[in-house]
């Protein structure tokens, strides 16, 4: 079972008091421990707790009583076998729970009891796999963590409403948040009245009315307030002191005036009080609305001073007296601004186990409602069992069939399995927090698993999120990465956890610190101590990048410390804790960026996101400059096989590694892995075993390499030789120029798999109030037929013919192109099929019947027509080959009829009826341009038809079938479906997007031959040319340090591990280290041009076109280049006819909407520069974005006279042209040529 699997959780967490815990060795911590521990806690405790809340179901009726008791202590998990896992394609566990059912049948004389025990199957619960993902229906899914408001009291302002007090920014309110159920909101209105709102009630209640309804008298309410409250109207004006309680309850009754017609006028006063009390205590003040939980009770004790015990988990009447008192006190003192509600101490985090716990509770609640609805309305005992009176003993009732009771109850109880599965699947398959796992590379997957969002059910909405919510809070330090967040509408709403943040038992974030005692860091003997936010705010903490001596004694006696999230400089004697590492404040993806402190935060954000979007390429290598954290997550996600023993690797193949373990007895161990791995983004990388000269492996060694891993280290892209140089305008605006070597040597080539699924269509629709059914028949020819052919055949002639006879005659006509190993090209036939349409029009049906009765032929069945479709397709192809041999007057003879152009009128009527009744269309699937590739797999399977999309095979049988038996009739049929997987090798091409690790990205604009690229002094051609203007404005200078240090490491054959915030080692430590390595490389490699004293970091390079040196030295280096998933193959499309936006009247955007580009000012420049005058005339006049121009273009299509008008947007271009004229007498020749081109556009300029 999962709970006993030691591989599932490699780390044991020890929980201590005060919500803190520590790890024995923090260096062995797991990055996915939050998800794994949360799921483990759910399986051990959460699932049992959900069943314990619904432990006893009791359904009572006048005739019977049924008790259902769950024995949750004996909950059993059964692991799915590997063979069955391939069938269901869902990783999970079969869950069984024992139940005890007791049924009591009530009779006039005796009560009959029946009790039995059964293990109830709850179905397959999708479980967390060892890779920390949910594998459902063959697809890997990840569940995001959600940030929600913590249960408790929240004081805040509503800035969207006006305040009734002076100097107040918005309406003040107090909200009581419960872990589940309702919440209470107390607000202060413009009329100086305090109201209370309830979540499930759509109106506001005055607080005094609410307190009176709880049973407090007027005197008891006012004796709690010992300060001036004249400015606050607790009692509205329409109430007086004598009958306040009665009118308060009448006010509640008026809100429910719909009950007035049901009252008896003679007993109105009594019934009013009864209905008010019953409604109030049933819907407003019940156990669900009063539940507050432990956290809310603790807030009531600390913030309000409620005298009730902390063990009281429900709101009481006295709580609202203290809540109203503190609310008025804060209004008087304007003490609402001190509350920082966006602080993480007021937030809680939920993982996948918490969601499934809530879904299980919801499923059990739905099951309880299902039992009440289905079993409460049964009035006759005979429905359960047959009870008869014994003639000899009239007082004794005997049950004829006891199994009826048991079977009936079990049939209803078995619905619990379907209800729970529906509840679980609704979360995993349609929930907003369950998403496709971003497993494009290992970094993208582990980042997706460590991400949390403020959106989702019960939380914020994207459109309503303010800037305050999206901004960075001081409490994020060390717990939430301030850099990594998406760009666009989700900015600030989706974040990533910092490297060392852990989630505690109650959902709050914890952070480890080293203890400092007497100026010495206690990191050797004492494990790190974990603090929550409130505990951390009371400590004096220093950062983890400070230098200390050999014995952990700090050098500086005055250090910058953090106390209550405020920075200050104080003596070292007042410091109590230190952060673990400089990396504690950033996330995993951000920590992989070298020289991070030299980059702007916005560009670091882009660099973090683009590393996740990297496609595995064939020429990827390890980073020359790395941070040292790129090997950590491979072992944490358990996706890479690791040697579990110390042994001798004597054999390795594509799927296994065999080891000999040498001890007293030589034993054999084998480790399996997948040779080919496909991602959810249709990318692919191939695993290959590591071949070493020394076959000995230590425990923990990585065993395979692929496109993202090389010798156990991350390899996202190749290390290319780059130069920062403007080159003939091709790298303008961040465009990128690459060497042709990157294409020919497959350096930036990626593997992709495209899955094509084609099935026989079964559809139904109504056209002009006529029912039509469609069914598709597979045929075996590439060239199909059109129904309106010169020859038609009698269906009866082919009724008893076998299609295999026609195959044997011409087997070459039936060659199948869909074979594994063949290369699919554009236009190739993927799946040959034709569509048959049945019309249920009564007139056509009667006409068709009369025709066949007149011809004395039997009504054709659907199988006959399928055979006819295949034969007709074959004969159509045969006619095309034999057309030259046949004469024009040749007639094709069949059983009874001769079809030619001179057919009789009677025969024409028959053909017309066939065309109207059976309509055959070509629905063959042909390969598109983006579907070209190598076919690697083909699966043909039968899929059962669904009840809603069935086409009847036999019309007569279908129409004669009763409605009650149609479902059985449908289950007899299946349809065919074919799945084809195509492997594509995508070379880098124009339009593809590439980037670095520092947020420097660009589009490939030109692929230059090797002989045209700039050269180093030793003749080495440059691989990639970047625009130097992209560095100063973006302020990401870290890429310069990486490229220069990579250049030194290439010639020294070294790799470097860089720590962030290296200013602790001295002023300009990064610059000094990089230049020293460059100087060393120039000496050891005997290449003095690597380090020029006057221009350190730059080199004189040669122009490949002229063979001469450039006038100025150029910055060169080796840097890791990433190929992103945004490839032009997936995005390029052509727009011929498309939609226009309603508001802007511009073409829609995007490939899915058939969008296009409006021809504006910049497009005009491009067409002018290219010299496309006639295309410019058409696009800039007739096809412009004006409605009038489109009307002119329509007139042009309809052969009407058209006019070429000049629109207002041409004024900008005309003004620019006027600025080109220096004087009236001098006109350059090029300008005169340009003015001549403008005449073709109907644009005339007189000078």
From Swiss-Prot:
Subcellular location: Plastid
InterPro entries the record matches: DNA-dir_RNA_pol_su2 (IPR015712), DNA-dir_RNAP_su2_dom (IPR007120), DNA-dir_RNAP_su2_hyb_sf (IPR037033), RNA_pol_Rpb2_2_sf (IPR037034), RNA_pol_Rpb2_3 (IPR007645), RNA_pol_Rpb2_7 (IPR007641), RNA_pol_RPB2_OB-fold (IPR014724)
One Gene Ontology term, aspect cellular component: plastid
Pfam families, sorted: RNA_pol_Rpb2_3 (PF04565), RNA_pol_Rpb2_6 (PF00562), RNA_pol_Rpb2_7 (PF04560)
This protein's UniProt keywords: DNA-directed RNA polymerase, Nucleotidyltransferase, Plastid, Transcription, Transferase
Entry function: DNA-dependent RNA polymerase catalyzes the transcription of DNA into RNA using the four ribonucleoside triphosphates as substrates.
Record protein name field: DNA-directed RNA polymerase subunit beta
Main localization, broad class: plastid
Gene Ontology process terms (BP): DNA-templated transcription
Recorded catalytic activity of this chain's protein: RNA(n) + a ribonucleoside 5'-triphosphate = RNA(n+1) + diphosphate
Enzyme class: transferase
The protein's Enzyme Commission number: 2.7.7.6
Family that this chain belongs to: Belongs to the RNA polymerase beta chain family.
Entry keyword Nucleotidyltransferase: yes
GO molecular function: DNA binding; DNA-directed RNA polymerase activity; ribonucleoside binding
Source organism of this protein record: Helicosporidium sp. subsp. Simulium jonesii
Quaternary organization: In plastids the minimal PEP RNA polymerase catalytic core is composed of four subunits: alpha, beta, beta', and beta''. When a (nuclear-encoded) sigma factor is associated with the core the holoenzyme is formed, which can initiate transcription.
């Amino acid at each position: 079972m999962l709970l006993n699997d030691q591989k599932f959780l490699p780390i044991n967490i020890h929980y201590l008091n005060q919500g803190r815990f520590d790890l024995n060795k923090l260096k062995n911590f797991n990055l996915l421990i939050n998800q794994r521990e949360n799921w483990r806690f759910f399986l051990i405790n959460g699932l049992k707790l959900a069943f314990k809340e619904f432990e006893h179901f009791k359904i009572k009726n006048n005739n019977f009583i049924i008790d259902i008791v769950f024995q949750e202590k004996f909950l059993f998990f059964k692991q799915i076998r590997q063979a069955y896992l391939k069938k269901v394609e869902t990783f999970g566990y079969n869950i069984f729970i024992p139940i005890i059912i007791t049924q009591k049948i009530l009779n006039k004389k005796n009560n009959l009891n029946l009790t039995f025990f059964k293990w109830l199957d709850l179905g397959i619960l999708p479980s967390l796999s060892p890779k920390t993902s949910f594998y459902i229906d063959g697809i890997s899914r990840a569940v995001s963590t959600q940030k929600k408001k913590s249960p408790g009291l929240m004081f805040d302002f509503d800035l969207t409403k006006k305040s009734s007090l002076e100097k107040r920014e918005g309406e003040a309110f107090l909200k009581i948040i419960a872990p589940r159920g309702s919440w209470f909101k107390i607000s202060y209105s413009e009329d100086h009245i305090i109201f209370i709102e309830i979540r499930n009630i759509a109106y506001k209640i005055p607080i005094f009315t609410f307190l009176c309804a709880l049973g407090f008298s007027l005197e008891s309410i006012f004796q709690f307030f010992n300060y001036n409250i004249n400015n606050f109207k607790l009692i509205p004006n329409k109430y007086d002191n004598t009958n306040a309680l009665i009118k308060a309850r009448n006010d509640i009754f008026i809100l429910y005036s719909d009950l007035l017609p049901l009252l008896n006028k003679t007993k109105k006063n009594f019934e009013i009080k009864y209905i008010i009390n019953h409604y109030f205590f049933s819907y407003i003040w019940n156990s669900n609305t009063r539940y507050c939980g432990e956290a809310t009770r603790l807030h009531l004790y600390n913030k309000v001073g409620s005298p009730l015990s902390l063990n009281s988990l429900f709101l009481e009447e006295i709580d609202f007296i203290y809540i109203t008192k503190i609310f008025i006190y804060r209004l008087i003192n304007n003490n609402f601004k001190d509350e920082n509600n966006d602080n993480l101490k007021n937030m809680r985090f939920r993982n996948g186990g918490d969601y499934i716990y809530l879904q299980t509770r919801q499923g059990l609640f739905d099951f309880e409602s299902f039992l009440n609805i289905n079993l409460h309305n049964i009035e006759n005992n005979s429905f359960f069992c047959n009870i008869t009176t014994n003639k000899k003993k009239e007082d004794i009732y005997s049950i004829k069939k006891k199994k009826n009771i048991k079977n009936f109850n079990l049939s209803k109880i078995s619905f619990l399995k379907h209800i729970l599965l529906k509840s679980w699947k609704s979360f995993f398959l349609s929930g907003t927090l369950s998403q496709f796992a971003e497993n494009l590379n290992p970094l993208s997957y582990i980042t997706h698993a460590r991400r949390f969002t403020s959106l989702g059910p019960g939380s914020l909405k994207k459109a309503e999120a303010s800037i305050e919510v999206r901004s960075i809070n001081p409490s994020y330090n060390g717990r939430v990465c301030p850099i990594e967040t998406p760009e666009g509408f989700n900015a600030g709403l989706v974040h990533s956890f910092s490297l060392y943040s852990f989630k505690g038992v109650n959902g709050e974030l914890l952070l480890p610190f080293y203890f400092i005692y007497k100026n010495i860091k206690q990191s050797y003997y004492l494990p790190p101590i974990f603090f929550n936010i409130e505990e951390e705010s009371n400590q004096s903490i220093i950062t983890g990048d400070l230098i200390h001596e050999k014995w952990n004694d700090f050098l500086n006696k005055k250090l910058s410390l953090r106390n209550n999230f405020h920075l200050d400089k104080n003596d070292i004697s007042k410091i109590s804790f230190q952060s673990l590492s400089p990396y504690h404040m950033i996330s995993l993806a951000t920590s992989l960026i070298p020289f991070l402190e030299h980059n702007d935060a916005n560009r670091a954000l882009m660099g973090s996101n683009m590393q996740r979007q990297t496609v595995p390429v064939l020429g990827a290598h390890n980073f020359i400059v790395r941070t040292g954290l790129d090997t950590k997550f491979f072992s944490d996600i358990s996706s890479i096989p690791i040697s579990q023993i110390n042994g001798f690797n004597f054999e390795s193949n594509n799927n296994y590694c065999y080891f000999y373990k040498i001890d007293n007895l030589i034993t054999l161990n084998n480790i399996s892995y997948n040779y080919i791995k496909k991602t959810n983004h249709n990318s692919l990388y191939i695993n290959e075993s590591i071949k070493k000269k020394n076959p000995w492996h230590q425990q923990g060694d990585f065993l395979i390499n692929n496109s993202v891993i090389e010798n156990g280290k991350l390899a996202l892209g190749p290390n290319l030789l780059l130069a920062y140089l403007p080159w003939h305008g091709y790298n303008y605006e961040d465009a990128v120029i690459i060497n042709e070597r990157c294409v020919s040597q497959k350096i930036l080539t990626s593997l992709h798999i495209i899955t094509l699924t084609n099935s026989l269509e079964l559809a139904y629709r109504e056209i002009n109030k006529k029912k039509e059914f469609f069914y598709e028949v597979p045929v075996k020819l590439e060239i199909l037929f059109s129904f309106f052919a010169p020859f038609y055949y009698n269906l009866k002639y082919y009724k008893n013919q076998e299609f295999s006879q026609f195959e044997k005659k011409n087997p070459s006509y039936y060659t199948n192109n869909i074979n594994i190993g063949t290369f699919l090209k554009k236009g190739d036939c993927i799946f040959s099929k034709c569509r048959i349409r049945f019309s249920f029009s009564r007139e056509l049906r009667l006409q068709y019947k009369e025709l066949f009765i007149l011809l004395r032929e039997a009504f054709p069945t659907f199988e006959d027509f399928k055979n006819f479709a295949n034969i007709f397709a074959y004969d159509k192809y045969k006619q095309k080959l034999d057309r030259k041999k046949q004469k024009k007057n040749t007639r094709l003879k069949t059983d009874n009829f001769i079809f030619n152009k001179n057919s009789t009128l009677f025969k024409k009527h028959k053909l017309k009826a066939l065309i109207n009744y059976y309509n055959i269309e070509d629905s063959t699937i042909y390969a598109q341009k983006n579907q070209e590739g190598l076919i690697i797999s083909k699966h043909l399977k039968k899929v059962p038809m669904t009840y809603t999309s069935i086409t009847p095979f036999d019309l007569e049988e279908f129409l004669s079938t009763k409605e009650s038996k149609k479902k059985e009739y449908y289950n007899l049929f299946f349809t065919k479906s074919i799945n084809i997987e195509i492997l594509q090798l995508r070379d880098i091409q124009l339009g593809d997007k590439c980037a670095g690790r520092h947020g420097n990205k660009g589009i490939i604009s030109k692929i230059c031959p090797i002989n045209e690229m700039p050269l180093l002094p030793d003749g080495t051609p440059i691989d990639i040319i970047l625009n130097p203007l992209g560095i100063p404005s973006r302020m990401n200078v870290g890429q310069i340090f990486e490229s220069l240090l990579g250049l030194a490491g290439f010639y020294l054959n070294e790799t470097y591990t860089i720590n962030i915030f290296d200013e602790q080692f001295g002023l300009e430590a990064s610059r000094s280290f990089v230049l020293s390595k460059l100087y060393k490389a120039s000496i050891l490699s005997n290449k003095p041009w690597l380090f020029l004293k006057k221009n350190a970091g730059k080199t004189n390079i040669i122009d490949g076109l002229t063979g001469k040196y450039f006038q100025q030295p150029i910055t060169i280096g080796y840097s890791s280049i990433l190929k992103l998933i945004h490839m032009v193959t997936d995005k390029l499309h052509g727009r011929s006819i498309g939609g226009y936006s309603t508001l802007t009247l511009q073409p829609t955007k995007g490939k899915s909407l058939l969008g296009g580009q409006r021809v504006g000012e910049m497009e005009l420049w491009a067409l002018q520069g290219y010299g496309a005058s006639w295309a410019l005339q058409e696009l800039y006049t007739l096809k412009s974005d004006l409605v009038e121009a489109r009307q002119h273009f329509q007139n042009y299509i309809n052969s009407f006279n058209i006019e070429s008008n000049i629109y207002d947007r041409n004024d900008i271009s005309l003004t620019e042209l006027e600025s080109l004229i220096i004087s009236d007498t001098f006109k350059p020749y090029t300008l005169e040529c340009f003015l001549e081109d403008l005449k073709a556009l109907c644009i005339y300029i007189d000078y």
